[in-house]
Amino acid sequence: MFNKTSKPQNRIDSLIGATTRIEGNVFFSGGLRVDGMIRGNVAGVDDQPNTLVVSSEARIDGEVLAAHIVVNGTINGPVHATETLELQAGSRVKGDVYYKSIEIHQGAVVEGRLVHHPAEMKGVELKLASGG
């Protein structure tokens, strides 16, 4: 009744295609699916429900922050899931993982620390990716 957790988005509002490469930070609300590559930080808008899906061929080189995160591909950087994190069998994370709730499938790889945060992770700020 008083639990303030958000529900994962069931629909994808934005898609970064397999042949797309982004250099810079990405901010989103709703559902974002990444099939391509992002070199920069990815963050869901704090005051709106958001879900990030990283597909099997996708790669993110940067810090990731979202309420709900599903990883099938590769993330090179710290991951902050303020609600749920699901690491699928083919996922690979190089960096520390901060989560409220986590599900790790057999075959998932994490090269970093797993840090549980039962309370909301407010105040997490992403540093801007420096060019060059």
Name each model feature, range by range:
Residues M1-D61, V70, N76, E83-G132:
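Intrinsically disordered, low-complexity terminal regions
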Residues V64:
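Extended lipid/amphipathic-ligand handling interfaces
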